[in-house]
């Protein structure tokens, strides 16, 4: 924890400096590699961790070494992870997917924005200083067309996005030759299909079946294709966003870049403060990962925070505004029905979802059914025209252990299953949001209920938190639940930071939340038996046993912290080659003792083998050469 708290002015200046000096950079001893596909422009980035050789013998003067293979890993940092790419936040990222979108010939550029709010913002000269300079000309589907990845998948079309994803999900493991590294324990997948090699056809089939989604708005061509589904790697989402009392555009862009560096597969912009529209434009134009939003937040700001004043017209305009900016998925709380609200009355913590409480208040104020539910087909029509995926929000999720798995929670879940089928009629991609606060013994039911009632659409959960007693450490309490539900089949985990329940996260909180959730997601991949998931673990264990300290740091999810902790007690360069660490010291290191035991056993085997050969030689008469029939 920082000793001195920065002022708001200092925080903003720090963020501005970060943006002004931003360069592509790799993690220590890593390099960016690209694997090309068959579609034009399919060039999939990965991070390759370079390892030092293993000492296998020889003398002090002439040591003998054995090379260790470089380890390729999934990389979400986009151009920010490539030192060869010049970064200019003012111009935004290269439009990777634009040629693929244009080649399909089913979109058209809009000469006039569809959103009245967008038109008003663009006409306001007072916003020129805040505005992203290179505003994208938005596209939408041509009349009579749908432009979603689900639509293409159902038609049997393998898009460049699907091939990109197949290469990415395989994580370059075909490059690994060592049997030691390729060894993997059998997993327990709870019904997930995990092929040894992920092909573009497998990706297409999973998307067509609704078991996976590719969030990829046609107006966010800067994003690198990724997939969310239980038959793929478990993904992690990071939340950023300003509020009425804190943060600026500069700080949110900084948090975006920071999030992708530390492994965020998607980012949700949950801004509720000033300049929401302008902040989102900066984020989208500089994001290599899909961006999600909760449109009801901005709609509420447009009616001055008064839930009762919300209307379908305001909400629809907000959907069009965000879809034409390039938002990849919307969280829509369409399952909070009027008849479900009384079910929450006996809860300890009531309705804790911000979106859920907004819609519950609207329903009660008007004594009408949720307009998001009533107008759901119109929402789907908008999404189909831009390929905005739907994340059906769990507005009635439990906010405490006591309220877990109650009547209101599962009633809403069943409604989300009904809405999923409606969205699929429009070829709109869907995932389902889940809890929340759930004790460990009750977590698996959430997954089985979702699979059954939501037709195997991908599940996306906030944690769940497994206990309520640890404010300040809820990244731990939720990381436990996240690892479990990821193992059971959850496709994406929404991170929780140490500030959960306490305040808006800063940069360091974002990192802590992401590292915790990358651990949870990876642990789930190991438990499921995802092919290749154990390679990095095996490489780390081998480096640890061989006292290759630099390799241990570099293979870590957070190399900087690993190195810092080691150097607190052994800061000298000699500590980086020592065959012990500060925990046990040189005489009591279990790994060193194990090596000595192994060397002794090997020597004994040789000695016994030589004795056996000597006895055999004497038994044969001591002749150097034997006749062929005697040999």
From Swiss-Prot:
GO terms for molecular function: 4 iron, 4 sulfur cluster binding; carbon-carbon lyase activity; zinc ion binding. Binds 1 [4Fe-4S] cluster per subunit. The cluster is coordinated with 3 cysteines and an exchangeable S-adenosyl-L-methionine. Its EC number is 4.1.99.17. It is an enzyme of class 4 (lyase). One of its GO terms (cellular component) is cytosol. Substrate binds at residues 239, 268, 297, 333, 353-355, 394-397, 433, 460. The keyword Lyase applies. Pathway: Cofactor biosynthesis; thiamine diphosphate biosynthesis. Zn(2+) binds at residues 437, 501. InterPro entries: ThiC (IPR037509), ThiC-associated_dom (IPR025747), ThiC/Bza_core_dom (IPR038521), ThiC/BzaA/B (IPR002817). Its cofactor is [4Fe-4S] cluster. Pfam families: ThiC-associated, ThiC_Rad_SAM. The keyword Nuclease does not apply. It comes from the Bacteria. Keywords: 4Fe-4S, Iron, Iron-sulfur, Lyase, Metal-binding, S-adenosyl-L-methionine, Thiamine biosynthesis, Zinc. One of its GO terms (biological process) is thiamine diphosphate biosynthetic process. [4Fe-4S] cluster binds at residues 581, 584, 589. It catalyses: 5-amino-1-(5-phospho-beta-D-ribosyl)imidazole + S-adenosyl-L-methionine = 4-amino-2-methyl-5-(phosphooxymethyl)pyrimidine + CO + 5'-deoxyadenosine + formate + L-methionine + 3 H(+). Catalyzes the synthesis of the hydroxymethylpyrimidine phosphate (HMP-P) moiety of thiamine from aminoimidazole ribotide (AIR) in a radical S-adenosyl-L-methionine (SAM)-dependent reaction. Belongs to the ThiC family. Homodimer. HAMAP family: ThiC. This is Phosphomethylpyrimidine synthase. It comes from Escherichia coli O1:K1 / APEC. The lineage of its organism: Bacteria, Pseudomonadati, Pseudomonadota, Gammaproteobacteria, Enterobacterales. The gene is thiC.
């Amino acid at each position: 924890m920082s000793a001195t708290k920065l002022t708001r002015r200092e925080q903003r200046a720090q963020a501005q400096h970060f943006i002004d000096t931003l360069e592509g950079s790799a993690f220590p001893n890593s390099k960016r590699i690209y694997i090309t596909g068959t579609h034009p422009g399919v060039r999939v980035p990965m991070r390759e961790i370079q390892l030092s050789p293993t000492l296998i013998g020889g003398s002090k003067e002439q040591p003998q070494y054995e090379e260790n293979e470089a380890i390729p890993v999934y990389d979400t940092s986009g151009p920010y992870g490539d030192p060869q790419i010049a970064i200019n936040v003012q111009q935004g990222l290269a439009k990777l997917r634009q040629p693929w979108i244009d080649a399909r010939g089913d979109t058209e550029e809009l000469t006039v924005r569809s959103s009245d709010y967008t038109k008003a913002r663009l006409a306001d000269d007072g916003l020129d200083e805040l505005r992203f300079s290179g505003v994208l000309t938005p596209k939408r589907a041509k009349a009579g067309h749908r432009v979603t990845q689900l639509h293409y998948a159902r038609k049997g079309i393998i898009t460049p996005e699907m091939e990109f994803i197949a290469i990415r999900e395989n994580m370059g493991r075909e490059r690994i030759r060592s049997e030691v590294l390729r060894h993997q324990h059998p997993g327990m997948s709870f019904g997930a299909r995990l092929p040894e090699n992920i092909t573009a056809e497998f990706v297409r089939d999973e998307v067509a079946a609704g078991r996976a989604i590719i969030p990829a708005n046609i107006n966010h061509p800067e994003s690198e294709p990724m997939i969310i589904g239980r038959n793929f790697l478990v993904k992690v989402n990071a939340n950023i966003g300003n509020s009425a009392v804190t943060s600026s555009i500069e700080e949110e862009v900084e948090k975006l870049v920071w999030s992708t560096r530390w492994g965020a597969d998607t980012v949700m912009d949950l801004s509720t403060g000033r300049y929401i529209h302008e902040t989102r434009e900066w984020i989208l134009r500089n994001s290599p990962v899909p961006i999600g939003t909760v449109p009801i937040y901005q709609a509420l700001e447009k009616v001055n925070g008064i839930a009762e004043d919300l209307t379908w017209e305001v909400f629809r305009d907000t959907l069009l505004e965000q879809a034409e900016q390039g938002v990849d998925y919307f969280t829509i709380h369409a399952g909070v029905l009027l008849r479900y609200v009384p079910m929450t009355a006996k809860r300890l913590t009531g309705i804790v979802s911000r979106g859920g409480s907004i819609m519950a208040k609207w329903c009660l104020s008007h004594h009408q059914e949720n307009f998001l539910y009533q107008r759901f087909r119109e929402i789907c029509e908008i999404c189909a025209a831009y390929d905005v995926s739907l994340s059906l929000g769990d507005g009635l999720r439990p906010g405490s252990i006591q309220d877990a798995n109650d009547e209101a929670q599962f009633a809403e879940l069943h409604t989300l299953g009904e809405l999923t089928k409606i969205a699929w009629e429009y070829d709109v991609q869907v995932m389902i949001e889940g809890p929340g606060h759930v004790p460990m013994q009750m977590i698996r039911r959430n997954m089985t209920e979702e699979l059954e009632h939501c037709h195997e659409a991908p599940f996306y959960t906030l944690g769940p938190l497994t206990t309520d007693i640890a404010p300040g450490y809820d990244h731990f309490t939720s990381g436990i639940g996240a690892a479990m539900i990821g193992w059971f089949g959850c496709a994406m985990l929404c991170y929780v930071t140490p500030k959960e329940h306490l305040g808006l996260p800063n940069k360091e909180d974002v990192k802590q939340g992401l590292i915790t959730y990358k651990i949870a997601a990876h642990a789930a991949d190991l438990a499921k038996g995802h092919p290749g998931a154990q390679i990095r673990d095996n490489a780390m264990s081998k480096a640890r046993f061989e006292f290759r300290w630099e390799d241990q740091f570099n293979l870590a999810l957070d190399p900087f912290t690993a190195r810092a902790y080691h150097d607190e007690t052994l800061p000298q360069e000699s500590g980086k080659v020592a065959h012990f660490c500060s925990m046990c010291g040189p005489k009591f290191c279990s790994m060193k003792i194990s090596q000595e035991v192994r060397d002794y056993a090997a020597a004994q085997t040789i000695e016994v083998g030589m004795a056996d050969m000597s006895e055999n030689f004497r038994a044969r008469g001591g002749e150097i050469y034997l006749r062929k029939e005697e040999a």
